[in-house]
Design a protein with these regions (language model features):
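Short amphipathic alpha-helical interaction segments
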Residues: 1-8
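Nucleic-acid-binding surface
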Residues: 7, 13-145
Length: 146
């Protein structure tokens, strides 16, 4: 009830169900990632979206790529557009680093795991994207060959 009044008074802006923002707040490039993280609490930003966060490659996905637990129901979101990748065990829990976007701590796979996952899921994103990610990550010194 209080949130409804604040929205009606123009002191808050409703972005999505359960997600509010201050009006006039500048939009960041990764705002959709913060929205998705709030609406999919067990999800982790992965693959093309994680490459974009790390500044690797030239891919600019129009969907938010998120990894969710294997047996979780698929989140039904109208906005932002979501692309779900199912993972389980250590594939889902290892290599997560929180990145703050618009005041929200968003779980994102680190650069090395993201590039490795690009090869694992090359049938979804394409081998050319995986090779570009490896080349660009190595050139930018964001990856090591340990």
């Amino acid at each position: 009830m209080v949130l409804t009044r604040l929205v009606a008074a123009g002191k808050l802006e409703r972005i999505a169900r359960g997600v509010y923002s201050l009006p006039g707040r500048p939009l960041s490039e990764h705002r959709s990632l913060a929205e998705a993280a709030l609406r999919v609490p067990r999800g982790v930003v992965c693959l093309l979206s994680a490459l974009r966060v790390h500044g690797i490659g030239t891919q600019a996905p129009f969907e938010v790529w998120m990894a969710i637990p294997h047996h979780s129901p698929t989140p039904l979101l109208d906005q932002p557009a979501l692309r779900v990748v199912r993972m389980s065990g250590t594939a889902l829990t290892e290599g997560i680093e929180p990145v703050e976007i618009d005041g929200v701590k968003v779980p994102v796979f680190n650069a090395a795991k993201t590039v490795a996952d690009c090869f694992k899921y090359r049938n979804k994103i394409g081998l050319d994207v995986a090779l570009e990610a490896l080349r660009d990550g190595w050139t930018q010194r964001k990856l090591t060959m340990d």
